[in-house]
Every structure is written in C-alpha cells, then in structure tokens.
Amino acid sequence: GSYRDHRRPESVTFVSELISDLSRRDFTMNAIALSADGMLSDPFDGVQAIRERTIRCVGDPMLRFNEDALRMFRALRFSARLGFTIEYETVAAISECAPLAAELAPERVRDELEKILLTTRPETLGVAIKFGLLRRYIPGNGWASPNYADIASMTRKPLTRWVTFSIMLQKYGYIPSAHAFLEELRLDGRTLRCCADAEEMLKCEAPTDKLGWKKLLSRYGVDSVACAVAAYDVINGLNCEKEFKAVLKSGECFSLKHLAVSGDDLLSLGLKGPELGEMLKFLLDYVMEYPDNNKREILLELAKYSEES
C-alpha cells in the first residue's frame, strides 16, 4: 500500500510473491532470502553489495526514503556499524530527502542515533548533521566542527555518550542547550538529570585534589560526575577520568550511604528533625576530609561533643 507521513504504510498488503516482498526492502543487502530447501533468492544483487561493502537502496532511493524517512538514518547506522560505504545515488537521495526526517517521531530518531552513538564510528553523527537530517533538533550551524570520533574512546554507555554528544554540540554552537536537545529527543529522566548536572559542573574547572572530587561526587552522584568528566576530557583533550576513577577505587566515603553512622544512631543522642540532618552533613564533610576517621565510635563521639559545645 501507499505510505502516509513518509513513515507508515496506510494498509498492510499481503505480498504473495517473494520478489515483490524483497523489492520493498530498504537496502539490497537486506533484500536476500533463503528458502527452506536452501535456495538463495537475491534478485537485487545484495550478496555482491555485501562483498563490495556497499549500502545501496533497492530500486529508486528517492522512493524508498519517501516510504519511510527513517531509512536515511538506517543507511548511516549500517555504515557506522559495518564500515560500509553508501553508494552515490543513495547519498544524493539522502541529501534531497533530508527534510522528510523532520516528520519522524522523536523516539524513532533517538533510537537510530543511539545505535550510531554506540558504534566505533560515532563521527557518522556529524554526517547526519551535515546532511540536515537533524535540522528539526539542530537548527543552526556551529562555528567549528566537533571531533565526534573522540566519543569512540569513552565507555560504551548510552548515558555517558548522549550527555557528551549533546554538550559537544552546545560547546561548538550547534544548539543553545544540551539539556533541551536531549529533552526534544525524548531521552529518559536519568539522562536529562545527568546532563543538567554536567552542564553545571562544566562551568567550573575540574577538581585538583581528592577532596574536591569527593565533594563533587557527594553533591551530584557518580553518574553525573562520570558524564561531566567524559565531556570535559573530550572537549579539552585532558584525562581527568584517571583521577576520578582513582577516587572511586579508593573506596573513601563521599555519601551518607557509606558513612559509618546513620540517622538512627544520631537519634539515640537526642537529635531529630533539621538538627539530625545538619549533623549528618557535618559528619560527612568531616569524613571526606579525614577518611581514616570514618568509624562509628569516632563519629558518635564527635557528634556528642559537637552537640554539647
């Protein structure tokens, strides 16, 4: 059947003939079938395309992309994941049909971008931007081209890579807000929170000592600091991650969860309400500065002394 909104068939038509079914596939390498008796059906030379490491649309690429504009992102994703080259006519059609991508649901675009982001060739995202596939989300042209390839050197976690990518775009003038960009693409709450935290942290210089790192971790949490460190290192060509990981590896306390005393312990001293919360914060600050003293007896004695004085 015909397609509506450049993304969905208006009706699902049962295709009886295999060749007719294969003719509706996106790329020739995906238009190959193997019958139950082992007979290979390859009417569009998909095997040859795989041998040549080439991504080529089945039939007219303009028609394929008008049927479903997401196929343009898929072409880039396969290129990034497999290292295949997109042939000229398909590239030309992507350039021509790029405005259709604005009609795609943000969730579908996000999912394809994430798959590209997690490959060993995240610089393919720069190609998507250059073609104008993300014009709905990135309306402007930056003053310099970020080195997206640097993202490949960091941990392959969606959270870290999304935050770093969005902050790079903001840093180089492509978008006004990293957080707003991720929000438009319908990223989850955890990613949005970490992005907002990272943006705030990146307004300052990186900590120069262990105590500074622990204070950051205490305020923002491990996930947010990890994202800020990744973005900071990529943008500035530094290696703060080494210091950050050393602090985590040390096992020293930077959160109430790892403090040797709890709120229940302080209740026994008669503390309650706001006073109890303030005392826990005081003890945490003390332990971050003197990590060897994170012992229940020492902290209870300190709390008692502080309360009496």
Residue locations for each model-derived region?
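Catalytic cores of the polymerase beta-like nucleotidyltransferase superfamily
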Residues: 1-309
